[in-house]
Amino acid sequence: MSRVAKNPVKLPSGVEVKFAGQQLSVKGAKGTLELNVHSSVEVTEESGELRFVARNGDQQARAMAGTTRALVNNMVQGVSQGFERKLQLVGVGYKAQAKGTVLNLALGFSHPVDYELPAGITAETPSQTDILIKGIDKQLVGQVAAEIRDFRPPEPYKGKGVRYADEVVRRKEAKKK
């Protein structure tokens, strides 16, 4: 058995799990998420916990049991608490402003960058240089944050660009004569 899949996923109060064939749906206070469970993984619910077992003992099935457990754990955490990712803009004149489903960015280009947020994702700008991405889908929150960072990744000489709040940018020394 996978070491990850050995640990059951505890269901907090207010979170419902439904099975429909291989379709697993998790419903909570913040929304609903769905997952197609691999055919080699068996999911059972007992006393407020979800358990994941590989149907046959081969390596692929054990790996899929662990992967499914991790994905479902993220779904349960997402619908109950949600996920957020914080970005910082470092540079003169770099600004961000959230307007509904569009994030307006001024990143030193000759034109403003307008990023359309996907469904289920919200962005807040507590200050002009901070962006807070929130949502219930961990993968989608991280993907949106990475796409925004890709507009102007931090450069190694001055550190200017869009970076994650907890990111440490490796700095290089300027060329000497």
From Swiss-Prot:
Keywords: Ribonucleoprotein, Ribosomal protein, RNA-binding, rRNA-binding
Pfam families to which the protein is assigned, alphabetical: Ribosomal_L6 (PF00347)
One GO CC term, this protein: cytosolic large ribosomal subunit
GO molecular function: rRNA binding; structural constituent of ribosome
GO biological process: cytoplasmic translation
PROSITE patterns: RIBOSOMAL_L6_1
Coiled-coil regions listed: none
Family: Belongs to the universal ribosomal protein uL6 family.
Role this protein plays: This protein binds to the 23S rRNA, and is important in its secondary structure. It is located near the subunit interface in the base of the L7/L12 stalk, and near the tRNA binding site of the peptidyltransferase center.
Subunit structure: Part of the 50S ribosomal subunit.
Protein name (Swiss-Prot/TrEMBL): Large ribosomal subunit protein uL6
Native source organism of the sequence: Pseudomonas putida (strain ATCC 47054 / DSM 6125 / CFBP 8728 / NCIMB 11950 / KT2440)
Gene (name only): rplF
